[in-house]
Amino acid sequence: MERKVMILSAGVGSGHNSAAAALQRNLANRPDVSTVTTLDILTTTPEFYRTVYDDGYFEMVAKAPWLVGWGYDQADAPFQLGSRVPWWDQINTTETVTRIKEFSPDIVLATHFLPARIVANLQSAQELFTRMAIITTDYDVQGLWITNTFSRIFLAREESRQYLIASGFPEDRLTASGIPVRYEFGQQVDRPAVLAQFGLRDGVPILLISAGAAGGPYALRIVQQMQARTEPFQAVVVCGHNADLKRDMDTLVGDDTDRFHVLGFTTAMPDLMRVASIFVGKPGGLSSSEAMAAGLPMALINPIPGQEVRNSDYLLEQGAAVRNNYETTIGWKLGELLADPARLERMRAAAQATGRPGAASTVVNDMLGDRDGQLWISDKAQRSLREASHLDKPDRPASPKQRLRTLIDTSSGRSVALITDGQLKELSKVMWASGTGMTLERARLREITTLQLDPTLVTMLRNVLAHRPDLKVSIT
């Protein structure tokens, strides 16, 4: 059966769209896929909204990074901000909704939390019938990514999966796949050809400095400090689309072109990352995953509070990176690494062990091979999940009514709903139940006025039964 796949992203930075592109490329020429389309939803929104959402975020990163970290922490627990799309986002994404409905996808792959929440809201209102996968793009999972319904969540690492399982999510709906990156990062590279293309010498360590992401002043300081180092090295400085930075960098480097090679935007990052010795840059989810897939150690600079700090924690824990906390010592720290080839080799081995170059294939194969529907989470179960994940309430047992219960389709063995024990007892009074099993009947749900059930529970169960008259479930 050929299916239509829609990949939804949001161009806040480049990482979410890069993950989307990796997925689209993996889906190309699949015989079981009829059509693939990728939509950056911000391109369908009003210019003012797009500016606030994208530029406003990076303005906050530059001028009030503490506020970014505070906001991350406030939304860290699942469902901390609820599962509904805020009115501000709703009124600015009407064209997005229209585009999604018109395409009518069989499968949605969401690489940003906003389109995931939009799709979940459409599914809850029975305005869209599809299977949605959420593909997270940082090493830790943040609560904003979790919706009240999904088919599967793909996570960057096993600890994030274990965190959600410990919070109460069914483990059959969670996959530690890694973050999707272009397949080239995991392939062998023609090293002599790449070195010749960029005028690099074999046998001399190569620093790959992501200057555009680091920001102009910081990147210039890195190069200034490296100009004073005496260790053998050569550096490729990538300025991206920042023409002013490239001009300033060219001026700073001057005639020292044997050691410093200044580039603007380049599509050759997969090649450069596979021949480099150290990547110098920020620990974004995608850039970090690309470096790990290429087996490239990282020297981390200026992480954004929240997700980038969490990413750097993980990379340090894996032994694949060092982090620089002082702008004035980055040259010294890089010199220490260059002077210790054995340490660099250990870091390279750690990066290779951490990398997941096949993440895109895992996502695509799992979603195309899985024919089961969505998991639905009741409003009361969402509150229980939120409380279970709070770090400031350690080991506080849930009240009997708040304990989570999973409804499992007996024919497929897959979880279909997450409710509370109190809701299960209500349901048992009106549905046929026996031991640890129950039969959910759509006809009975039509009798809501006489059933006296929680209306939100009835609405959720109607979604569970949207395409079948009844469903036999076991309960755990």
Where are these regions (language model features)?
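Active-site and donor-binding regions of nucleotide-sugar-utilizing enzymes
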Residues: G71-G168, R173
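Short hydrophobic beta-strand element within catalytic cores of glycosyltransferases
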Residues: F279-G281, P297-G306
